[in-house]
C-alpha cells in the first residue's frame, strides 16, 4: 500500500475453523508482525499481517467491529467482509491491552470518518437535487466506492429509493415532456461529470499502485542480487576459515591444552581458597562452642548455688512457720486465761457491789 504502519506488535495468528465455527486454526507457525495501517486513498484503517510474502490478515476496521479479550493473552474480532473470525495470541497481557486500545482508537476514527463522509454526501446531494428539481440522487464519494461492504450497503439503500421518485417530484414544477427531458439531460450531464472525476481518481490510484508494485519488484530483484552476493561472500569466508583452521590446528591444540591447564589451576586455587575459608569458619565455630561451654558451666554452678540457697531459705521459712504457730497457740492460751480472769473479776465486782449495798442498808437501819 505504500503507507507506514501506525502501530506494530508480534503475535500468533489464528482463524476460526470455517467448518466447525468452534476450533481455532493457526495460520502462522510462529509469532509474526501484526500492524495497523491507514489507507489514505480509501480513508480506512486496516489490520495487516504477513507471513513471509503471504498475507494472513487483511482486515478493514469498521465502526461495528468489536475486539474481545477472551483470556489474559488472547483476543479476537469478527470480519464480516472476510467471513471469518481472527484470533491473536500475545506473549503478555500488556501487549494484548495495547493492541485492544489501538483497535478501539482506530474503530472510533473509522466511525468519525464515516460520519464525515455521510455529511459530505448529504451536503453534495442537496444542491444537486435542488438544481435538477428533485430529479437527482445523492452523488457517490470515493469513500463509498472504495470502502468496505459495510460502508457501501447504507449508500445503496439510501440511493435506491430516490430512483423511483424523479418523475413524481418533477410534476409540480414542470408540465411538459420538454421540461422533463431537459431535467433528465442536466442530471445525466452531472452524473457523467461525477463518474469522469471518479474514473480519473481511480486511474490516479491505479498509477500509484502500479508504481509501488514496480518499485517493490525492483527492490525484490535488488535484494535477490544482494542475497546472492552475500551467499558467495559467506562461502568464500567459510573456505578461508577452514584453511586457517587446518593451518592452526596444532597451535590451537597446544593453546587449548594450556588453557585447560590454566583453568584447572585456577579452579584448584579457588577450591583451596574455599577450603581455607571453610577451615577458618570451623575454627571460629569451635571457639564459639568453647565460649558457650564455659558460659554453660558457669551458669550451671550458679544454678547449683541458687538451689542450695533456696533450700536454706525453705528451711528457715519452715522454722519461722513453726514459731508462728507456737506463738499463735500461746497467744490463744493467754487470751483464754485472760477471759477467765475477766469473768472471775466480774463475779467479784458483783459480789462487792452486793456487799456495799448490804452495808449501806445496815447503816441506814442503825
UniProtKB/Swiss-Prot annotation:
Documented effect of changing residue 344 to R: Dimeric form. Does not form the high-order complex with SHANK1. Does not change its interaction with STX12. Reduces localization to the spine. Affects dendritic spine structure. Decreases synaptic transmission
Substitution effect: residue 76 to R: Normal binding
Region called Disordered, residue ranges: 114-189
Compositional bias ranges of the Polar residues kind: 138-147
Coiled-coil region list: 193-364
Pfam families registered for this protein in UniProt: WH1 (PF00568)
Major location category of this protein: cytoplasm
Chain segments carrying region Required for tetramerization: 302-366
Effect of residue 76 to A: Normal binding
One BP annotation, GO: behavioral response to cocaine
A Gene Ontology term for the protein's cellular component: glutamatergic synapse
UniProt-annotated location(s): Cytoplasm; Postsynaptic density; Synapse; Cell projection, Dendritic spine
MF (Gene Ontology): G protein-coupled glutamate receptor binding; identical protein binding; molecular adaptor activity; protein-containing complex binding; scaffold protein binding; signaling receptor binding; structural constituent of postsynapse; transmembrane transporter binding
InterPro entries associated with the record: Homer (IPR045027), Homer_EVH1 (IPR044100), PH-like_dom_sf (IPR011993), WH1/EVH1_dom (IPR000697)
Keyword list, A-Z: Acetylation, Cell projection, Coiled coil, Cytoplasm, Phosphoprotein, Synapse
Residues carrying N-acetylglycine: 2
Residues with the Phosphoserine modification: 318
Consequence of substituting residue 70 to E: Disrupts binding to SHANK3
Tissue: Highly expressed in cortex, Purkinje cells of the cerebellum, hippocampus, striatum and olfactory bulb. Isoform 1 and isoform 3 are expressed in skeletal and cardiac muscle.
Residues covered by the WH1 domain: 1-110
Phosphoprotein recorded as keyword: yes
Role, per record: Postsynaptic density scaffolding protein. Binds and cross-links cytoplasmic regions of GRM1, GRM5, ITPR1, DNM3, RYR1, RYR2, SHANK1 and SHANK3. By physically linking GRM1 and GRM5 with ER-associated ITPR1 receptors, it aids the coupling of surface receptors to intracellular calcium release. May also couple GRM1 to PI3 kinase through its interaction with AGAP2. Differentially regulates the functions of the calcium activated channel ryanodine receptors RYR1 and RYR2.
Record text about domains: The WH1 domain interacts with the PPXXF motif in GRM1, GRM5, RYR1, RYR2, ITPR1, SHANK 1 and SHANK3. The coiled-Coil domain forms an antiparallel tetrameric arrangement.
Protein family: Belongs to the Homer family.
Subunit structure: Tetramer; this tetrameric structure is critical for forming the high-order complex with SHANK1, which in turn is necessary for the structural and functional integrity of dendritic spines. Interacts with GRM1, GRM5, ITPR1, DYN3, RYR1, RYR2 and SHANK3. Interacts with IFT57 and OPHN1. Isoform 1 and isoform 2 encode coiled-coil structures that mediate homo- and heteromultimerization. Interacts with SHANK1; forms high-order polymerized complex with a mesh-like network structure, at least composed of SHANK1, HOMER1 and DLGAP1; the complex formation is SHANK1 multimerization dependent.
Protein name: Homer protein homolog 1
Amino acid at each position: 500500500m505504500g503507507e507506514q504502519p501506525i502501530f506494530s506488535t508480534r503475535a500468533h495468528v489464528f482463524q476460526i475453523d470455517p467448518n466447525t465455527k468452534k476450533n481455532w486454526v493457526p495460520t502462522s507457525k510462529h509469532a509474526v508482525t501484526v500492524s495497523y495501517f491507514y489507507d489514505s486513498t480509501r480513508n480506512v484503517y486496516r489490520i495487516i499481517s504477513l507471513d513471509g510474502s503471504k498475507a494472513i490478515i487483511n482486515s478493514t476496521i469498521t465502526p461495528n467491529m468489536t475486539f474481545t479479550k477472551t483470556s489474559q493473552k488472547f483476543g479476537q474480532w469478527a470480519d464480516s467482509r472476510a467471513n471469518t473470525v481472527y484470533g491473536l495470541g500475545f506473549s503478555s497481557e500488556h501487549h494484548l491491552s495495547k493492541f485492544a486500545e489501538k483497535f478501539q482508537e482506530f474503530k472510533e476514527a473509522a466511525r468519525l470518518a464515516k460520519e464525515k463522509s455521510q455529511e459530505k454526501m448529504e451536503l453534495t446531494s442537496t444542491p444537486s437535487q435542488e438544481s435538477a428539481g428533485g430529479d437527482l440522487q445523492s452523488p457517490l464519494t470515493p469513500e463509498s466506492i472504495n470502502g468496505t461492504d459495510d460502508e457501501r450497503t447504507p449508500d445503496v439503500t439510501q440511493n435506491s429509493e430516490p430512483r423511483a421518485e424523479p418523475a413524481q417530484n418533477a410534476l409540480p414544477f414542470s408540465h411538459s415532456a420538454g421540461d422533463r427531458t431537459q431535467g433528465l439531460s442536466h442530471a445525466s450531464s452531472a452524473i457523467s461529470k461525477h463518474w469522469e472525476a471518479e474514473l480519473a481518481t481511480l486511474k490516479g490510484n491505479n498509477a500509484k499502485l502500479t508504481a509501488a508494485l514496480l518499485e517493490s519488484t525492483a527492490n525484490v530483484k535488488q535484494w535477490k542480487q544482494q542475497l546472492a552476493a552475500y551467499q558467495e561472500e559467506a562461502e568464500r569466508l567459510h573456505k578461508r576459515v577452514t584453511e586457517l583452521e587446518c593451518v592452526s590446528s596444532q597451535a590451537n591444540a597446544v593453546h587449548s591444552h594450556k588453557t585447560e591447564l590454566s583453568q584447572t589451576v585456577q579452579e584448584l586455587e579457588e577450591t583451596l581458597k574455599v577450603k581455607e575459608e571453610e577451615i577458618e569458619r570451623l575454627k571460629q565455630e569451635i571457639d564459639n562452642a568453647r565460649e558457650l561451654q564455659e558460659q554453660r558451666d558457669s551458669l550451671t554452678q550458679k544454678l547449683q548455688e541458687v538451689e542450695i540457697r533456696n533450700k536454706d531459705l525453705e528451711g528457715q521459712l519452715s522454722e519461722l512457720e513453726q514459731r508462728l504457730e507456737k506463738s499463735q497457740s500461746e497467744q490463744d492460751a493467754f487470751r483464754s486465761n485472760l477471759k477467765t480472769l475477766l469473768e472471775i473479776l466480774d463475779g467479784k465486782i458483783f459480789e462487792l457491789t452486793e456487799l456495799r449495798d448490804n452495808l449501806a442498808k445496815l447503816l441506814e437501819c442503825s
